[in-house]
């Protein structure tokens, strides 16, 4: 992995035009100041020139992918906002919906006219014994290209699909999360030897839809919810059995997803910082991945599975459609008891001033605008990027002598 250069330039036409107009207004005001303000050396004029130069630098120069003014504004907004309210906004109770000829009951969450549904994916080991799958791969994976192909399904256009994976480190918590009581009873969680229990990964696909972009699709179906549920069921059926086990979640399961993605982060006890998010039992630090580095090797490295400082990792891959082509971006969040050592984040780009936004962007929450915008790359036709799901290593077999 390689982090992008710390400083850069944002030179879009819209930004340059806005900055030019602001500078022009500043110079006009400075040139029309009273003579008593100008003095012999035209002090007011040169002060105006200095302010214009400062505004230009702050608006054009970027730090870690964001302009200085945007970074400071975002940080001040997060710092002044109540984290509990900010993270809870949009986490409305979901409603179960089943299509007239549908098979599954799908939970739909609505907020400000936008809709969200969630698909859970895993390796299928916990399914009933009578359910057979003809998997085309040896290990359970989510093929990113397959998900991207389903951003548009006939007349339904999704705003985007987020692939969110949470990995809890080995130990008692991961043993509980692995949910195999026959293999690991409660009395055995604390009796593991030197080898740790398996790191537990849980993965969800979060589908987002803007009804205003799907007027024709909605007109031919029962309702808004039915339109998104149709796309959700179709994507789940495409993934299920081919490379992983997939099923849409019901309404009562969405609240559990909120809690799992927060990874024990308590919103009401959190304080946003410039470089991390401080909460009552540790730190949450978010980074974005350089687009050119979003590949299988990088996705294997970002977990930091061997780092004892990290208790949980949350990885988000975002797929959106831009100009008819799918684009991919990624960011990762680490939970630790202390501040994350710098050597663990080498090659990643810190989300400076946007730590709270990074947490909220990973939640299954409908939003009228993107909570987080990071650099992305085009997903090519031959891109074979896959995200493994399920456990990352076998349970420890060593135990105490008495056991």
UniProtKB/Swiss-Prot annotation:
Segments passing through the bilayer: 9-29, 43-63
Q: Which UniProt keywords apply?
A: Cell inner membrane, Cell membrane, Membrane, Transmembrane, Transmembrane helix, Transport
UniProt KW Protein biosynthesis keyword:
no
- Tell me the InterPro entries matching this sequence: EccE_dom, T7SS_EccE
One Pfam family per UniProt:
EccE
* Principal location listed in the UniProt entry: membrane
The compartments listed are: Cell inner membrane
Question: Its membrane topology, per UniProt?
Answer: Multi-pass membrane protein
One CC-aspect GO term: plasma membrane
Whom does it interact with, and what assembly results?
Answer: Part of the ESX-5 / type VII secretion system (T7SS), which is composed of cytosolic and membrane components. The ESX-5 membrane complex is composed of EccB5, EccC5, EccD5 and EccE5.
| Assigned protein family | Belongs to the EccE family.
In UniProt terms, what function does this protein have? Part of the ESX-5 specialized secretion system, which is responsible for the secretion of EsxN and a number of PE_PGRS and PPE proteins.
| Protein name stated in the entry | ESX-5 secretion system protein EccE5
What species does this protein belong to? Mycobacterium marinum (strain ATCC BAA-535 / M)
Q: Which gene encodes it?
A: eccE5
């Amino acid at each position: 992995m390689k982090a992008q250069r710390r400083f850069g330039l944002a030179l879009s036409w819209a930004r340059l035009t806005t900055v030019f107009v602001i500078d022009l207004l500043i110079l006009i005001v400075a040139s029309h100041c009273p003579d008593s303000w100008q003095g012999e050396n035209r002090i007011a004029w040169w002060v105006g020139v200095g302010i214009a130069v400062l505004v230009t630098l702050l608006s054009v120069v970027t730090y870690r992918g964001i302009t200085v003014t945007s970074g400071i504004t975002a940080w001040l907004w997060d710092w002044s906002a109540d984290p509990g309210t900010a993270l809870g906004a949009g986490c409305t109770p979901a409603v179960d919906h089943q299509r007239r000829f549908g098979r599954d009951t799908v939970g739909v969450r609505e907020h400000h006219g936008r809709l969200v549904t969630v698909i859970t994916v895993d390796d299928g080991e916990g399914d009933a014994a009578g359910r057979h799958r003809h998997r085309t791969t040896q290990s359970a994976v989510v093929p990113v290209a397959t998900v991207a192909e389903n951003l548009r399904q006939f007349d339904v256009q999704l705003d985007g699909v987020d692939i969110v994976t949470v990995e809890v480190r080995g130990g008692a918590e991961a043993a509980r999360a692995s949910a195999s009581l026959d293999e690991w009873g409660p009395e055995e969680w604390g009796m593991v030897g030197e080898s740790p229990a398996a790191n537990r990964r849980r993965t969800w696909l979060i589908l987002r839809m803007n009804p205003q972009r799907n007027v024709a699709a909605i007109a031919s179906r029962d309702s808004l919810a039915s339109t998104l549920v149709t796309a959700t069921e179709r994507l789940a059926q495409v993934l299920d059995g081919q490379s992983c086990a997939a099923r849409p979640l019901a309404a009562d399961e969405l609240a559990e997803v909120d809690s799992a993605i927060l990874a024990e982060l308590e919103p009401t006890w959190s304080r946003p910082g410039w470089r991390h998010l401080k909460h009552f039992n540790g730190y949450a630090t978010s980074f974005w991945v350089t687009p050119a580095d979003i590949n299988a090797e990088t996705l294997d490295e970002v977990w930091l599975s061997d780092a004892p400082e990290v208790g949980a990792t949350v990885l988000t891959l975002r797929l959106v459609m831009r100009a008819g082509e799918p684009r991919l971006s990624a960011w990762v969040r680490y939970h630790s008891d202390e501040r994350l050592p710098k050597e663990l984040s080498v090659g990643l780009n810190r989300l400076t001033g946007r730590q709270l936004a990074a947490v909220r962007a990973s939640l299954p929450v409908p939003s009228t605008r993107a909570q987080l915008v990071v650099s992305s790359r085009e997903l090519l036709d031959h891109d074979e990027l896959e995200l493994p799901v399920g456990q990352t290593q076998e349970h420890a077999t060593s135990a105490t002598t008495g056991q």
